[in-house]
Each structure stands twice: as structure tokens, then as C-alpha cells.
């Protein structure tokens, strides 16, 4: 009996610890409906995120990926762009609704603000999640502010 209680406590502690580690090392938007009416092919979500040294080290880069939860629709994909002071990168979820994310892309511009854009390729509603991380030069997660939405239309 004592052994099973100990095993249970170890399991619970491991799950709680892993959940805590995941929560401090990943940033993910909630599910968002892009173009709720479905009638604006140029609908754009635009936000700003800042990277800073939270004690884990100076930021080197911003990494993003996007996941489209919507059912597949011909010629309708969700893309995300990250824009620094001098560089930008773009990624697209090529298979909507498959449970997978787009390829990660990265812009190396250190601390400060990064602009994030999410758009779609045509008419229709899309439901997406964006992941975003500030990383040190060694790939360690460092300070990442919550996005400040600038435009959603």
C-alpha cells in the first residue's frame, strides 16, 4: 500500500512539474476566429510582442508557428509573419485541421518589439492558434511579453 501511494505521489508530482515547465517555456494564443463573418479575404490580425531578459539570458530571437483548426477548404490557408527591425520571416499551416503546426520560423533581432501578423489566403472563416517564443542564443526560453493587439479586421 505504501509503495502505491509513493508511486502515485511521484506520478502526480511529475505531471505537475511537467505542466509548470510547459507553462513557463511556451506561449500560445487562445483559439482565435480570423474573420468571423467570413467575407473579408484580406482580414488581418496584427500584434506586437517584446522579448526581454527574465534571468534566463539575453534574448536572441523570436520563433513563431501557426496552427489552423478549421476544416480544410480549397485555396484557404492561414499564414503568420514575424517582423523585427530589419528582418522578417513567414510560415503557413499547409494542412488545415490536421492537428499539426506550420514550420517554425525565427527572426534574430535580440530584445525589443517584434510585430506579428496573421492572415488568410481568401474568403472564409479560420480558427487558429499562434505559438511565439523569445529564445536566447543557446535556445533557452527567455522573457516574452503577452501580445498587444494593434489591429483585428
Show where each model-derived region lies:
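Short, surface-exposed beta-strand/strand-loop-strand elements in extracellular ectodomains
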Residues: 72-92
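Bacterial N-terminal signal peptides
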Residues: 11-20
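Bacterial N-terminal signal peptides that target proteins for export
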Residues: 2-12
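Short, surface-exposed binding/anchoring microloops in extracellular/periplasmic proteins
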Residues: 39-77
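Beta-sandwich interaction modules
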Residues: 53, 98-109
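Edge beta-strands of jelly-roll/beta-sandwich modules across compartments, strongly enriched
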Residues: 45-47, 76-78, 114, 122-149
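Non-catalytic extracellular/lumenal accessory regions of secreted precursors
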Residues: 23-52, 136-153
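Noncatalytic modules at the cell exterior or secretory-pathway interfaces
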Residues: 60-62, 107-127
Amino acid at each position: 500500500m505504501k509503495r502505491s501511494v509513493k508511486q502515485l505521489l511521484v506520478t502526480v508530482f511529475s505531471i505537475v512539474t511537467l505542466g509548470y515547465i510547459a507553462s513557463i517555456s511556451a506561449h500560445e494564443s487562445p483559439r482565435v476566429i480570423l474573420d468571423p463573418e467570413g467575407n473579408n479575404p484580406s482580414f488581418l490580425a496584427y500584434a506586437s510582442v517584446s522579448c526581454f531578459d527574465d534571468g534566463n539570458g539575453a534574448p536572441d530571437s523570436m520563433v513563431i508557428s501557426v496552427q489552423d483548426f478549421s476544416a480544410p477548404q480549397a485555396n484557404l490557408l492561414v499564414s503568420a509573419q514575424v517582423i523585427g527591425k530589419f528582418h522578417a520571416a513567414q510560415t503557413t499551416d499547409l494542412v488545415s485541421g490536421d492537428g499539426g503546426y506550420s514550420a517554425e520560423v525565427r527572426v534574430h533581432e535580440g530584445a525589443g518589439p517584434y510585430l506579428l501578423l496573421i492572415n488568410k489566403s481568401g474568403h472564409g472563416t479560420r480558427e487558429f492558434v499562434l505559438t511565439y517564443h523569445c529564445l536566447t542564443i543557446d535556445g533557452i526560453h527567455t522573457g516574452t511579453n503577452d501580445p498587444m493587439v494593434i489591429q483585428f479586421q
